[in-house]
């Protein structure tokens, strides 16, 4: 099943917050793409005029018919009722960051294997096993903190990490980043929050360069990387076959610049990591 085919099986009702505080209500099969359309002036006339900014409310429905009924019900609410609903949603759904342990491997694996089966964000086609991912969590967090984002009920919304860009010693100051959000968590800032915290940690550890390998095409991933300051420095066509032929693009973010010999990278203390995560708490 391709990522495009998967979208038609999901339906959501949402409210978008505009620059003047107004709320626009609608429904969609793909929250991330719909929010981008609103923000880029390609959505509804109302959000073009009022300047859409972010999701204020997002609710998954069983199908399109249910989403349309829920949309109609939301539109009948008073402004005060809508604001109460949005406040409750924000309290529950805005991300709380923490550090992963081996015990989190099963939840992380559930998110990753969804992308393996349904999306081209990863070129892996065979799902990973829990023992594999328990070992992966241990090896990943041994080098750089593995970050989690959870909602107010403890549901895992996404994770972010980094690993060596290349095993040879001269690459010691370069890492490749990885970030995945749960399918239902895409489009309302989880990825941005995780990624910014990860980049702050990498900067604090003394890394110079962060690279991201992105399936081509993957416009949503390209948007988040461009927004965070990454530059596309190369595209390889026809690199992999998954739901059709795909290219691969390399995105680069320099954390430092210069020609001097770099200082060795170093781990951060628990207190330093917690201070960084605290900057991004809901």
Language-model features: where?
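A short beta-loop-alpha structural element at the N-terminal edge
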Residues: 96-108
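Acetyl-CoA-dependent GNAT
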Residues: 17, 127-184, 195-196, 254-256
């Amino acid at each position: 099943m391709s990522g495009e085919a998967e979208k038609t099986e999901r339906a959501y009702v949402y409210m978008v917050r505009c620059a003047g505080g107004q709320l626009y209500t609608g429904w969609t099969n793909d929250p991330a793409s719909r929010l981008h359309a609103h923000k880029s002036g390609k959505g509804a006339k109302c959000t073009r005029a009022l300047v859409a900014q972010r999701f204020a409310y997002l609710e998954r429905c069983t199908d399109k018919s249910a989403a349309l009924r829920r949309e109609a019900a939301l539109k009948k609410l008073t402004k005060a009722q809508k604001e109460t609903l949005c406040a409750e949603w924000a309290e529950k759904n805005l991300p709380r960051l923490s550090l992963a342990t081996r015990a989190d491997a099963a939840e992380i694996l559930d998110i990753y294997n969804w992308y393996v089966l349904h999306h081209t964000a990863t070129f892996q086609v065979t799902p990973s096993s829990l023992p594999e991912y328990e070992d992966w969590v241990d090896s990943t967090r041994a080098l750089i903190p593995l970050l989690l984002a959870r909602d107010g009920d403890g549901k895992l919304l996404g994770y972010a990490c980094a690993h060596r860009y290349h095993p040879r010693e001269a690459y010691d100051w370069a890492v490749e980043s990885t970030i995945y959000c749960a399918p239902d968590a895409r489009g309302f800032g989880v990825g941005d929050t995780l990624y910014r915290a990860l980049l702050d940690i990498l900067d604090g550890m003394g890394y110079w360069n962060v690279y991201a390998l992105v399936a081509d095409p993957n416009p949503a991933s390209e948007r988040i990387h461009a927004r965070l300051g990454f530059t596309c420095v190369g595209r390889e066509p026809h690199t992999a076959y998954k739901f059709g032929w795909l290219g691969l693009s390399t995105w680069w973010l320099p954390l430092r610049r210069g020609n001097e010999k770099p200082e060795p990278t170093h781990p951060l203390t628990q207190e330093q990591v917690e201070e960084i995560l605290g900057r991004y708490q809901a």
